[in-house]
Design a protein with these regions (language model features):
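Secretory targeting and sorting signals
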Residues: 1-21
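Conserved serine DD-peptidase/penicillin-binding transpeptidase domain
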Residues: 20-30, 36, 40-42, 91-363, ...
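A short, well-structured edge-of-sheet supersecondary motif
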Residues: 42-68
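Short beta-strand scaffold segments in enzyme catalytic cores
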Residues: 54-56, 100-102, 447
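Residue-level preference for non-acidic, small/hydrophobic
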Residues: 62, 81-88, 151, 183, ...
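Small-residue-rich helix-loop
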Residues: 65-67, 330-520
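Short active-site loop at a secondary-structure junction
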Residues: 67-87, 92
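A short glycine/serine-rich beta->alpha loop
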Residues: 69-74, 264, 373-376
Length: 520
């Protein structure tokens, strides 16, 4: 290993090709004891042959307190959501709401609408089946009994590109990789838009189980090849949507007497899904549509007959950030594009995200933003860039709502602790550290805010790539070490025992966010 130190900057540059462990390049920290403690964490053998970057700064001044490879570009996974959410709060505002309308070009006369009925999406990723039922009820209350025309689903607020750049094709069936549409349905109050829940109930041994969709829809086709096994037998049930198809295959065995099995699957055409759910709601209200269900644009002369507004953006941030919801991120990106340029595309929206980051001092020439959620393998950030954003965000008028929406370490409440609810429990970081997680195969990240033992507010970012065994517990060790650090006594902070953290923590799947597996 060759090492060079520049006298002017104190930068330590290590030959990356020959380093036996994670490469080292760092500036002198304000507290050598803190440097030693963090260096000990990063000496874990799981970092051997991997890439790891750590930045620690004062949250108010931006002063660098620890740096390791902070200019190294790495895939950030869901840490990308920090940039997307901050740009959305700045451009759209915390009070922004998404609106879904029902319109017609003809008035209601004698209970009839003698024109097409238009269901116009405004990009709301939180629309539930009950919200579509409410729209139908509004029409009923307005006297609508019959539509002499078609039901037209309008998703033109966004473009028709369904998936972002460099998303893995084999993720397509899984609900964290759903299609983005301006008109969609969420099947639950996690607001997993563009997905449906497949519920499988066991029958008697040897019989087929009962399979149902929530909400009920014809947007996907169930192929039930499963069987009911004997009571107490192994559950080998598998639910998977066929690639590039609307067919969902249910196979394997579910034991008799078992509880209902739930699996979330993506829907290939969320616009058709929304139209189907709304058409069912109309029928439930006794409203007849004489024509067909199709897709199209709403004429400018159409008048609003019913409307639904989403929660405010500041409220949406909670399920979005706590549960690391990819579809919320992509809906926000396309909304940024639509509001700024009239084109709801990734290209237009990501330009707004980059512009916000650049305005806040992030060098956007050395990073790459390819989507809003971090699911793209093309995304590249540095911990310098993340730390720059975290320091800048603290000065924003909307900061408190954004900060509160970040997962909080060790807090067991699902919509408080989020993806950190089972991490750093009963430590100095518990209910102290607010951070955004990130997880994909051979990618893990944690960035956010924590106060040390003296009450000094810190920002930190740790991103690791290309490891074989997950070093996620070392992120927790960093968070706890920072929370325990005191400058007053001059002693080294006690380095958190990552082995103890691993024993006491259920991290869930190593390759995805725990919320994506409904494990947190």
């Amino acid at each position: 290993v060759t090492t060079a130190v520049t006298a002017t900057s104190g930068l330590v540059a290590t030959n990356l090709t020959t380093a036996p462990a994670a490469q080292v390049a760092q500036t002198q920290a304000a507290d050598p004891a803190l440097t030693l403690a963090i260096d000990t964490i990063l000496a874990d053998p799981r970092f051997t042959g991997s890439m790891v970057s750590v930045a620690v700064r004062d949250a108010n001044t931006g002063e660098a307190l620890y740096e390791r490879n902070t200019g190294q570009r790495l895939n950030p996974a869901s840490n990308m959501k920090l940039f997307t959410s901050a740009a959305a709060m700045d451009a759209l505002g915390p009070d922004h709401r998404f609106t879904t309308d029902v319109l017609a070009t003809a008035p209601v006369v004698g209970g009839k609408v003698r024109s097409d009925l238009f269901l116009r999406g405004g990009g709301d990723p939180t629309m539930l089946a009950e919200d579509y039922r409410d729209l139908a009820a509004q029409l009923k209350a307005a006297g609508v009994q019959r539509v002499d025309g078609n039901l037209v689903a309008d998703d033109s607020y966004f473009d028709d590109v369904p998936l972002a750049t460099a998303w893995s094709w084999d993720d397509e069936p899984y609900y964290y990789s759903a299609v983005t549409s301006a008109l969609t349905v969420a099947p639950d109050t996690d607001y997993d838009s563009g997905t449906a829940i497949v519920e499988t109930s066991p029958g008697s041994p040897g019989a087929k189980p009962t399979v149902a969709l929530q909400p009920a829809t014809d947007a996907v086709t169930i192929v039930n090849n499963a069987t009911t096994g004997a009571a107490g037998s192994a559950n080998t049930l598998s639910v998977e949507r066929e690639h590039a198809s609307d067919k969902v295959f249910v196979t394997g065995s579910i034991p008799a007497g078992a509880s209902i099995n739930q699996e979330w699957v993506t829907v290939p055409d969320p616009t058709t899904y929304a139209a189907d759910v709304f058409a069912r709601a109309l029928r439930a209200q006794g409203i007849t549509v004489s024509g067909a269900v199709r897709e199209g644009a709403t004429p400018g002369a159409a008048k609003v007959l019913a409307s639904h507004d989403s929660m405010a953006l500041s409220g949406l941030l909670v399920p979005f950030m706590k549960l690391s919801n990819n579809m919320h991120a992509e809906a926000l990106v396309k909304t940024l594009g639509a509001e700024a340029t009239g084109t709801g595309s990734w290209q237009a929206g990501l330009a707004q995200v980059r512009a916000y980051a650049q305005e806040k001092g992030v060098d956007t020439n050395v990073i790459r933003i390819s989507d809003g959620s971090g699911l793209s393998r093309f995304d590249l950030l540095t911990t310098d860039a993340v730390a720059d954003l975290l320091v800048a965000a603290k000065q924003e008028p909307w900061f408190q709502a954004w900060y509160d929406a970040l997962p909080i370490a060790g807090n067991a409440d699902r919509f408080t602790g989020g993806t950190l609810r089972s991490r750093m429990r009963n430590t100095a970081a518990t209910d102290n550290l607010h951070g955004k997680t990130g997880s994909m195969t051979s990618v893990t990240a944690l960035s956010g805010y924590v106060s040390n033992a003296d009450g000094r507010e810190l920002v930190f970012s740790m991103i690791s790539n290309n490891y074989l065994a997950s070093p996620r517990s070392q992120e927790d060790a960093l968070g706890v070490t920072l929370a325990q650090w005191s400058e007053a006594d001059g002693a080294a902070p006690p380095t958190a025992d990552s082995r103890s953290l691993r024993r006491s923590t259920d991290y869930g799947p190593a390759d995805i966010e725990c919320s994506w597996a409904k494990a947190c």
